[in-house]
Amino acid sequence: MTRMDHRSIISDTTQYFESNEPLQLELGGELPGVRVAYRTWGTLNAEKSNVILVCHALTGNADADSWWCGMFGEGRAFDETRDFIVCSNVLGSCYGTTGPMSVNPLSGRHYGPDFPRITIRDMVNVQRLLLRSLGIDRIRLIVGASLGGMQVLEWGAMYPEMAGALMPMGVSGRHSAWCIAQSEAQRQAIAADAEWQDGWYDPEVQPRKGLAAARMMAMCTYRCFENYQQRFGRKQREDGLFEAESYVRHQGDKLVGRFDANTYITLTRAMDMHDLGRGRDSYEAALGALKMPVEILSIDSDVLYPRQEQEELARLIPGSRLLFLDEPYGHDAFLIDTETVSRMVCEFKRQLIVDN
């Protein structure tokens, strides 16, 4: 077992928004209130027309300038001299926003496995509460990949009057059976750990083996065959451990020190519920209703959200444009080749100016 040290994870510049109003959740649950951890960069202009919302992935947080650092800087995708960039920790996470590790004010103890089921739409609703508290009613561009990309798409479907333009990356319009099966295998790995205790473990002490195993499984889908072959092949260390084994073990150990098992389960279940068509006329109609400018980034080597899923989005979203990132890094390419991704975002921003 290991203890989490949130002090080393959450930036000192993190701000917090709190709402004491009950939050009604899509699947019928309710939270008595919500706290949102967020960060901003740059200055909101007088017209409030320079807002960029960055949506993070599964184990990310509000510190976008850390996990997506190559996207920040003058002349880059997120330019603090021109843009007002906002990134918040999603509902259900463990980096400052209300989630399973939060104390339930009604019981006086951590929510743990009692945290209600949430969806991507609930995450977007909480982000909207935050932005409205900042006096923002229009977002120039919403950007995100993976779980972040799901939020981007739901922003367009839920609040088209606020969403000026969308750039979802490495994502589908509805979670596939392939992705759902991957998520469930990872959740079962956590549940198989004796320290899991049906989710009622000490919130400061992790079911280490299960969460690490879940992360190791996930890392096999975040990269790809070619990446593992080129990077590790059949190389072995002096102790006989294959380098590929050493790599995934290291990734598992790293996550255990910075994440929470109940949070992992909460967020992967929310991802499994991702479906733009749920409760709407149809999947096709929901995508067809997205009238704002949309650029979709597809990663050629992504085995988790393969190219055909982004091609489907492009086919169903009117006037959308499909871009390809041809890199041998797998799903995580959006985090690795930030030079190319930043350039693509900059080109989209320039096109938005021309079109306006």
Curated annotation (Swiss-Prot):
GO process annotations (BP): homoserine metabolic process; methionine biosynthetic process
Binding positions (substrate): 215, 332
Pathway listed: Amino-acid biosynthesis; L-methionine biosynthesis via de novo pathway; O-acetyl-L-homoserine from L-homoserine: step 1/1
Residue ranges occupied by any AB hydrolase-1 domain in the UniProt entry: 50-335
Family, similarity comment: Belongs to the AB hydrolase superfamily. MetX family.
PANTHER family assigned: HOMOSERINE O-ACETYLTRANSFERASE
Subunit structure: Homodimer.
Function text: Transfers an acetyl group from acetyl-CoA to L-homoserine, forming acetyl-L-homoserine.
Protein name: Homoserine O-acetyltransferase
Organism encoding this protein: Chlorobaculum tepidum (strain ATCC 49652 / DSM 12025 / NBRC 103806 / TLS)
